[in-house]
UniProtKB/Swiss-Prot annotation:
Listed GO CC annotations: cytoplasm
Cofactor: NH4(+); K(+)
The protein's name: Type III pantothenate kinase
Domain of life: Bacteria
Organism phylogeny: Bacteria, Pseudomonadati, Pseudomonadota, Alphaproteobacteria, Sphingomonadales
Length: 260
């Protein structure tokens, strides 16, 4: 079985695969100071609770956008699973697609993995939207080439900036406005919900419309990340909502290495 490790700026997701099927997954907050032993206590207990013997893991693949977290996760793989981990984007785990951008080496692992998975699962011209700490918009053409994209502040970052800079504004949850259907709020909290949520939807729809116009061909939109389902319920701009896209991309990469 494959243990895929997706290290984001906010969370780390561990997923256990049999082939391309996710058998289980576990999530922990990203903290580069966490030791290999601390990861092991947490992860091995969860695996055992669900009936998985660590010996079933034959391959570990790590994708990270937090370089400082890589060392201790590699030690975890070696010390507790007896495996040298594969690292996404490093030999022998090459991306296998053309990156038609100014600095291909600067492409984040998460975005590259998303591009691989999206092309495999949804053939054609694509825009991949990933709601994370930042919200990224990536263009993948019908040949699977990465053509560039957009990086925007994530909605939580936007809300944090608003609340931290305006002393009298309260902290609110990230959710669709429920107390009013109007976009003209009559109290502070409603106005904030409308501004944060519908403002983000408008930004997202506007950017996608501009990207589609520039691509010049019909492009399907694939949404992933923690808030994809929430936004997918309030816009028709998405063709697919796929919260497992990044993990599936890791399984595809691991499969390629096995075939080699």
């Amino acid at each position: 079985m494959l243990l895929a490790v997706d290290v984001g700026n906010t969370n780390i997701v561990f997923a256990l695969f049999e082939g391309r099927e996710i058998k289980s997954r576990w999530r922990v907050a990203t903290d580069p100071r966490r030791t290999a032993d601390e990861y092991a206590v947490w992860l091995l207990q969860l695996m055992q609770l669900q009936g998985f013997d660590p010996k079933v893991v034959k391959q570990i693949l790590i994708s990270t956008v937090v370089p400082r977290a890589l060392h201790n996760l590699s030690v975890l793989a070696q010390k507790y699973f007896g495996l040298d981990p594969l690292i996404a984007g490093q030999p022998p785990v090459e991306w296998g697609f053309e990156a038609d951008v100014d600095e291909p080496r600067s492409l984040g692992a998460d975005r590259a993995v998303n591009a691989i998975a999206a092309h495999a699962k949804y053939p054609g011209d694509l825009i991949v939207v990933d709601f994370g700490t930042a919200t990224t918009f990536d263009v993948v053409d019908f040949n699977g080439a990465y053509k560039g994209g957009i990086i925007a502040p994530g909605i939580n970052l936007s809300l944090d900036a608003l609340v931290n800079a305006a002393a009298k504004l309260p902290r609110i949850a990230i959710e669709a406005p429920t107390r009013t259907k109007s976009v003209i709020g009559r109290n502070t909290e409603d106005q904030m919900h409308i501004g944060v949520f519908w403002g983000y939807v408008a930004m997202m729809e506007g950017l996608i419309a501009r990207m589609r116009a520039e691509i010049g061909r019909p492009a399907k939109v694939v949404a992933t990340g923690g808030l994809a389902v929430l936004f997918g319920d309030h816009t028709d701009i998405f063709d697919h909502v796929d919260t497992d896209l990044t993990l599936d991309g890791l399984a595809i990469l691991a499969e390629r290495v096995t075939v080699q």
